[in-house]
Each structure stands twice: as C-alpha cells, then as structure tokens.
C-alpha cells in the first residue's frame, strides 16, 4: 500500500510505498535509512502517566519511590505540567504531575498493572512506547 507522509511546514504530503521496505525516516524530502540495531543499542520501554496537581512534591516523590522500590522501573522522572482535557463533557484545565518511567520489556506489563491498581484517577493516562538506548543504559535499566 501507500502511506501519506508530510514533507514540511507546508503540510504537503507525498505517498510512500510500504510493505517489504526497510524502515526509514522522511525528513523534509530526504530519505534516511535507519541504522540496523546492533550490539551498540538495546530496546527499552517508556511508560508515562500523570498524577493530580493537588499532590505535593513529597507525595509524588513517595509514589515514584514505590515504583523504584518494587523494581518495576529503573528511573522515574516527575515534573509539573498544565493539562487541558475533556472530562464528563466539560473542558477542564488542571495542574498535574507528568510521570515518565524507564523500564524493561520483562517489567512493563507488571508496571502498567501497578499503575492501574494504585492510581488516584478513575481513568488514568497510561501510555507507553519502545525506545532504543545505548547498550550501557539498556544494561543499567535491565538491572
């Protein structure tokens, strides 16, 4: 098939054939072949959620520390953000804590389950994606 790809600020797009083609990135019309994964890198997972802005820094720190103590993530980043979202038909604007966790493939599903079971929101944001890191960082996250 064909995949439309944006080619810059004009939002013009071109059609790129997909299927049976090596992976690539298209950047302003320049085709860049991605390097194959080698022993120089490893695949990890970033799991992201948010916590209520009403929680103070110590409370958020304790929540994050419990993730580390359970050995489900190697590192947890936390920062304040402002979020705009629709909840129960109303547009809301709220201060929240953005929480980003680095974890391994073997711990990802258990980490997601822990977040679901202990999260203060009825419908928490829980999203995740794989990332490639240096082999040294990969080994550190693996434990």
Short names for language-model regions:
Residues 1-143:
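Positively charged, small/polar-rich N-terminal and surface patches that mediate targeting and assembly
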């Amino acid at each position: 098939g064909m995949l439309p790809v944006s080619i810059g600020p004009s939002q013009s797009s071109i059609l790129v054939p997909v299927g049976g083609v090596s992976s690539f990135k298209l950047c302003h019309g320049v085709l860049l072949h991605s390097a194959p994964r080698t022993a120089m890198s490893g695949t990890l997972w970033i799991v992201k959620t948010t916590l209520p802005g009403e929680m103070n820094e110590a409370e958020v720190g304790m929540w994050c520390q419990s993730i580390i103590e359970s050995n489900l993530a190697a590192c947890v980043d936390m920062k304040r953000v402002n979020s705009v979202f629709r909840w129960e038909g109303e547009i809301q604007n709220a201060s929240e804590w953005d929480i980003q966790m680095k974890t391994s493939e073997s711990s990802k599903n258990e980490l997601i389950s822990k977040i679901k079971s202990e999260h203060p929101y009825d419908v928490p944001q829980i999203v995740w994606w794989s990332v490639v890191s240096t082999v040294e960082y990969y080994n550190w996250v693996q434990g």
